[in-house]
Curated annotation (Swiss-Prot):
Alphabetic keyword roster: Chaperone, Cytoplasm, DNA replication, Metal-binding, Repeat, Stress response, Zinc, Zinc-finger
Domain of life of the native organism: Bacteria
Domain J: 5-69
Xref: InterPro entries: DnaJ (IPR012724), DnaJ_C (IPR002939), DnaJ_domain (IPR001623), DnaJ_domain_CS (IPR018253), HSP40/DnaJ_pept-bd (IPR008971), HSP_DnaJ_Cys-rich_dom (IPR001305), HSP_DnaJ_Cys-rich_dom_sf (IPR036410), J_dom_sf (IPR036869)
Keyword Transcription among record annotations: no
SUPFAM superfamilies found in the cross-reference section: Chaperone J-domain, DnaJ/Hsp40 cysteine-rich domain, HSP40/DnaJ peptide-binding domain
SMART domains for this protein: DnaJ
GO cellular component: cytoplasm
Residues given in the record as Zn(2+) 2 binding sites: C165, C168, C191, C194
Protein name: Chaperone protein DnaJ
Organism field: Geobacillus sp. (strain WCH70)
Residues given in the record as Zn(2+) 1 binding sites: C148, C151, C205, C208
Cofactors that this protein relies on: Zn(2+)
Length: 380
C-alpha cells in the first residue's frame, strides 16, 4: 500500500512554514494521541502524524522528501545493485563499471562487521498541568536491548570464539562466475550461512542465544524542563539501545502528554481562565482574588465591566521552555445572571429598573432599543 503524502497527513500546503507545520502537528497529535483517542486506528494515525512531522520539520529531510518523495534515490531500478556484479571482464569497453554505477546507484556493500549506531527509542510520559509548567526530575524504566554480560556481546559461549565461515571463507560473500560473449561476469551475493559477517558461532551463548544482546529494563534519571508542552519531545542523548560492533548508542526520545486542567487552559506560554462575577460586582466594581500557577493575586474590576472583558496578568503564565521569560495569564470575566430569586429580590430588581429611568436607553444601547421599537411599530 502506497504511503500517504506527508503534507496531506498534516493538512498543510507544500509551501507551509515551519511554524504552520508545527501548529498542525500539535493539533493533530492531541486529537489522535492514544491516551486520549480510544478509536482502533488512533495509534496508527498518531504514528503517521509523528513520522510526517519528523520529516517536514527538518530542513534537510524535507528538501530530500520534496525532491524524491518516499522513494530512496539510492535504490536504483527495481533493487538492482551494481555491487552485485563484477564488470572487470569489460576492459575493452572502458568504464562499464562507472556507467552501471551511475545508473544503478553505485553503492558499495555495507560491511556487516562495521560499527553501527544503536536504535533510537521512544517513551511516552504523562504529566499534570503543573508538572509541565514547572518541570520535574524523575526516574523512568525503559525496556531495551543491552549487551549480554555473559558473552560481552560476541554471542559465543564463554571460552569459545567465532569461527571463520567455511562457505564464504570469511569474505561474507558467495560468488558465481558466468561466461558471456562479452566477457566474464561474477555475481556476488551475501553469504546466507553467516549473514555476510564472514564468521559463525559454533557454540552459542546460553544467556542470549547467540545474539549478543538481552532484553532488560533500564532505569534512567530524567530532568524535565519547566514549560514543556503537550506533544513536545525531549532527547536524552546516548540512552537508546547500545551500538553494534562498537558503534555509538542511540538516543531516547521522551514524548510528553499533558493532562488538561480543570480551571486553566494553555496556549503556548500563556494561560487563560474564566472568572464569574455577580451583577453587583460588574456594575459597582470590586477587587477579587484570582488563582494563578504562582499563587493568588488581586485583580481590580472597574465599575461597569461587561461580560467577556479580558484582563492580563503579566508574567503569570508558563515559563518558556527555552528560558525566554514567562507568558501571561488572561482572565476573562463572565457576569452570572441569577436564576433563582426570592420575591424580595425580584421586587428590588424591579425597583432598580424603575429607578434606572432612561439610563439604559442612552448612548449605544439607546440607539439599539430605538431600532427595536421602530421595528415592532413598522417604522423604517
Amino acid at each position: 500500500m502506497a504511503k500517504r503524502d506527508y503534507y496531506e497527513i498534516l493538512g498543510v500546503s507544500k509551501n507551509a512554514t515551519k511554524e504552520e507545520i508545527k501548529k498542525a502537528y500539535r493539533k493533530l497529535s492531541k486529537k489522535y494521541h492514544p491516551d486520549i483517542n480510544k478509536e482502533p486506528d488512533a495509534a496508527e494515525k498518531f504514528k503517521e502524524i509523528k513520522e510526517a512531522y519528523e520529516v517536514l520539520s527538518d530542513d534537510q529531510k524535507r528538501a530530500h522528501y520534496d525532491q524524491f518523495g518516499h522513494a530512496d534515490p539510492n535504490q536504483g531500478f527495481g533493487g538492482f545493485r551494481s555491487d552485485d556484479f563484477d564488470f572487470g571482464g569489460f576492459s575493452g569497453f572502458g568504464g562499464f563499471e562507472d556507467i552501471f554505477s551511475t545508473f544503478f546507484g553505485g553503492g558499495r556493500r555495507r560491511d556487516p562487521n562495521a560499527p553501527r549506531a544503536g536504535a533510537d527509542l521512544q517513551y511516552t510520559m504523562t504529566l499534570t498541568f503543573e508538572e509541565a509548567a514547572f518541570g520535574k526530575e524523575t526516574d523512568i524504566e525503559i525496556p531495551r536491548e543491552e549487551t549480554c554480560d555473559t558473552c560481552h556481546g560476541t554471542g559465543a559461549k564463554p571460552g569459545t570464539k567465532k569461527e571463520t565461515c567455511s562457505y564464504c571463507h570469511g569474505t561474507g560473500q558467495i560468488s558465481t562466475e558466468q561466461s558471456t560473449p562479452f566477457g566474464r561476469i561474477v555475481n556476488r551475493r551475501t553469504c546466507p550461512y553467516c549473514g555476510g559477517t564472514g564468521q559463525y558461532i559454533k557454540e552459542k551463548c546460553t544467556t542470549c542465544g547467540g545474539t549478543g544482546r538481552v532484553k532488560k529494563r533500564k532505569k534512567i534519571h530524567v530532568k524535565i524542563p519547566a514549560g514543556i508542552d503537550d506533544g513536545q519531545q525531549l532527547r536524552v542523548a546516548g540512552q537508546g539501545e547500545p551500538g553494534i560492533n562498537g558503534g555509538p548508542p542511540g538516543d531516547l526520545y521522551i514524548v510528553f502528554h499533558v493532562e488538561p486542567h480543570e480551571f486553566f487552559e494553555r496556549d503556548g506560554d500563556d494561560i487563560y481562565c474564566e472568572i464569574p462575577l455577580t451583577f453587583a460586582q460588574a456594575a459597582l466594581g470590586d477587587e477579587i482574588e484570582v488563582p494563578t500557577l504562582h499563587g493568588k493575586v488581586k485583580l481590580k474590576i472597574p465599575a461597569g465591566t461587561q461580560t467577556g472583558t479580558k484582563f492580563r496578568l503579566k508574567g503569570k503564565g508558563v515559563p518558556n521552555v527555552r528560558g525566554y521569560g514567562y507568558g501571561d495569564q488572561h482572565v476573562i470575566v463572565r457576569v452570572v445572571t441569577p436564576t433563582k430569586l426570592t420575591e424580595k429580590q425580584k421586587q428590588l430588581l424591579r425597583e432598580f429598573d424603575q429607578l434606572g429611568g432612561s439610563s439604559m436607553h442612552q448612548g449605544p444601547y439607546g440607539r439599539f432599543f430605538d431600532k427595536v421599537k421602530k421595528a415592532f411599530k413598522g417604522e423604517s
